[in-house]
């Protein structure tokens, strides 16, 4: 959808309503090329992209733009919910199949919120995908890294040095925002007292990915 906003801004610029020309924005084409190259790298000419969607999908038109770009490049697309993956999916020698179609890449447009995993069947489907040879966008570890508690832990003293050289860790920290947990331990109680006095300078975020669900 952001690509459409860019097109709108370009039109406004042509009509001299905007004085600065917006930068080009080819996210959909870039996405399609990346998926196609990933499947080619796997060496599976018959593999498809599994687009994981919600049962009552609200972003249908957004997804159709991606679907069209992939189809133009010869990439097959299978749209399915977690329940459908559970019912129709299986592992064959470690490869993920949904019905008669082998899956090379799983693109998660669902599965980010607790409501997407309401029962044992949906969680079983997620575990099956994680255990497969398919490329997951994102895999569980990357998805967890998008949650605030994991980000808070990674920002802690001495943690980044376990993954990157200390000098690189110091450079990364320059881009971190200060984060406080609100647990019942001493640190959490101290943080609550501090935040009560400085509430207008902080955002209350739940343990969820993405930029929503915030309290200002």
Predicted features by range, described:
Residues 2-216:
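Domain-scale recognition of functional cores that engage charged ligands
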């Amino acid at each position: 959808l952001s690509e459409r906003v860019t097109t709108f801004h370009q039109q406004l610029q042509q009509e001299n309503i905007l004085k600065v020309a917006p930068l080009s924005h080819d996210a959909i084409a870039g996405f399609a090329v990346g998926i196609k190259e990933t499947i080619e790298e796997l060496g599976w000419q018959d593999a498809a992209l599994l687009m994981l969607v919600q049962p009552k999908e609200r972003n249908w038109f957004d997804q159709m733009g991606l679907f069209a770009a992939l189809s133009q490049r010869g990439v097959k697309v299978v749209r399915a919910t977690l329940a459908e993956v559970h019912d129709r999916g299986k592992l064959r020698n470690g490869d993920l199949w949904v019905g008669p179609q082998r899956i090379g890449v799983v693109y998660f447009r669902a599965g980010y919120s607790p409501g997407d995993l309401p029962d044992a069947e949906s969680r079983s489907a997620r575990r099956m995908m994680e255990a497969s040879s398919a490329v997951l966008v994102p895999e569980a570890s990357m998805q967890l890294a998008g949650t605030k508690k994991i980000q808070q832990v990674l920002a802690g003293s001495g943690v980044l040095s376990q993954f990157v050289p200390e000098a690189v860790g110091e450079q990364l920290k320059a881009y971190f925002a200060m984060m406080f947990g609100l647990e019942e331990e001493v640190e959490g109680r101290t943080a609550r007292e501090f935040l009560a006095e400085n509430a207008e300078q902080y955002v209350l975020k739940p343990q969820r990915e993405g930029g929503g669900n915030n309290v200002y």
